[in-house]
Amino acid sequence: MKTLLLTLVVVTIVCLDLGYTRRCFNQQSSEPQTNKSCPPGENSCYNKQWRDHRGTITERGCGCPQVKSGIKLTCCQSDDCNN
């Protein structure tokens, strides 16, 4: 009986998603659209844009990084919100 109970507990833990992870787009300007699961505890997505000799560059990912002046940064807190 104890073995059956232990087996049920292990199966429940394996099958249930015990922690939620944020999903964010993570491609740069010219790359195909992709998204990824963020590390545990990372609850934000960002969209960062700046201009250089190539034109407007867009970078997307998990988190909300510090940026220098002249760089447009948008952070959000829902799945795939940084497109």
Curated annotation (Swiss-Prot):
Keyword annotations: Acetylcholine receptor inhibiting toxin, Disulfide bond, Ion channel impairing toxin, Neurotoxin, Postsynaptic neurotoxin, Secreted, Signal, Toxin
Gene3D superfamilies: CD59
Chief place where the protein resides: secreted
SUPFAM superfamilies the record matches: Snake toxin-like
Heme is among the record's keywords: no
Domain of life according to the entry: Eukaryota
S-S pairs: 24-45, 38-62, 64-75, 76-81
Record's subcellular location: Secreted
GO cellular component, one term: extracellular region
Residues in the signal sequence: 1-21
Tissue note: Expressed by the venom gland.
Keyword DNA-binding: no
Coiled coil segments of this chain: none
Recorded GO MF terms: acetylcholine receptor inhibitor activity; ion channel regulator activity; toxin activity
Protein task: Binds to muscle nicotinic acetylcholine receptor (nAChR) and inhibit acetylcholine from binding to the receptor, thereby impairing neuromuscular transmission.
Family: Belongs to the three-finger toxin family. Short-chain subfamily. Type I alpha-neurotoxin sub-subfamily.
Protein name stated in the entry: Short neurotoxin VAN-10
Protein's organism: Laticauda laticaudata
